């Protein structure tokens, strides 16, 4: 899987990983569930993994997520608030993002085939669920995540991550 880590976009790495799995494993092994997880989320719990596995078996596509606590604003291109979505309908998506292998593989194959036209269509892929949402008719289930499953990406994240790791 060495080449998987040398891609420009995250989705390129995931696609390379999916192709490597499909090529390296017997066919029956690619008929199961695949977890796609962000290495910047080191505190994922067994409970989240189990819930995602159960929901992926039931719905074929799910992502760990938590309801947002803050009000969210959608901004225009000049940084002015344009609209405010209903907070009770807005979720913060985490990883793992979990899918039946065939569904996520086929969605990524469509992405790969149309990759050159994404920018002109105004599409910026930000996660694996978006690949499924954009290139299939399949819905993605939001599965209960945890506020402790934080993404550690900036120095400001470290004290909270350390606190969680100590507890």
Kindly give the residue locations of the regions a language model identified:
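Conserved beta-loop-beta/alpha segment of the NTase-like Rossmann-fold superfamily
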Residues: 10-75, 94
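Short, flexible, basic/aromatic active-site loop/helix in glycosyltransferases
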Residues: 74-99
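Residues at secondary-structure transition points
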Residues: 8-12, 16, 120-127
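Short, hinge-like loop/turn segments at secondary-structure boundaries
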Residues: 20-21, 53, 78-84, 159-161
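Short, flexible turn/loop "capping" segments at secondary-structure junctions
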Residues: 33-34, 84-88, 142
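Short secondary-structure boundary/capping segments
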Residues: 25-26, 54, 82-83, 132, ...
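Conserved alpha/beta core of the MobA/IspD/sugar-nucleotide pyrophosphorylase nucleotidyltransferase superfamily
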Residues: 91-167
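Short, small-residue-biased leader/transition segments that mark boundaries at the very start
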Residues: 1-5
